[in-house]
């Protein structure tokens, strides 16, 4: 069919596939990242990498879905690409790995982060990389007021005492979330 595309590789990087059962092999997230480097710009590949390293997945026709755990990490993607000497797309993938982050919880968090920290030549403002969904513990003396023991900051620069929250209407429109966010 027109939706199937075959690719030839002369030598596959180690751990490119996992057995999905009954001998059916599928590409690992790390190998998918490297394969997509042939088709995407650096900025698009970074966005894809943050999805792989995040707790959400974009759906083709509908809202994103949540995942319990990321499919991979920025460190695993970087190590895989570094070990794939001579692979098609490797130069693009290596460049993209410099900008990967772990822990994005939504596509909009990813886009906001990319806008803020990617360099100007990749469409961003060039700020330092933030930490995503960074845990900030609430001091015991303030927990009653805060009604929680910790907060997760969408984007955080702890050294600058700066946090940025992306408040989507979809995620924050529930009455329970609105009262929680108001605090």
Where are these regions (language model features)?
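Short gly/ser-rich loop at a beta-strand->alpha-helix junction or flexible surface loop bordering the NTP-binding
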Residues: 1-89, 110-113, 120
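Surface segments flanking catalytic/ligand-binding clefts of nucleic-acid enzymes
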Residues: 67-183
């Amino acid at each position: 069919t027109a939706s199937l595309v075959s690719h030839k590789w002369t030598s596959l990087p180690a751990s490119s596939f996992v057995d999905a059962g009954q001998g059916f092999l599928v590409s690992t997230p790390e190998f998918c990242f490297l394969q997509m480097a042939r088709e995407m710009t650096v900025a698009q590949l970074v966005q894809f990498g943050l999805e792989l390293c995040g707790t959400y997945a974009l759906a083709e026709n509908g809202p994103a879905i949540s995942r319990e755990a990321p499919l991979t990490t920025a460190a695993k993607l970087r190590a895989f690409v570094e070990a794939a000497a001579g692979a098609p797309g490797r130069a693009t993938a290596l460049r993209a790995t410099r900008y990967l982050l772990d822990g994005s919880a939504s596509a909009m968090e990813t886009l906001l982060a990319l806008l803020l920290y990617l360099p100007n030549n990749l469409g961003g403002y060039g700020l330092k990389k933030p930490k995503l969904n960074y845990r900030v513990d609430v001091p015991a003396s303030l927990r009653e007021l805060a009604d929680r023991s910790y907060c997760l900051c969408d984007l955080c620069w702890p050294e600058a005492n700066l946090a940025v929250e992306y408040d989507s209407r979809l995620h924050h429109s529930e009455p329970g979330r609105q009262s929680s966010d108001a605090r």
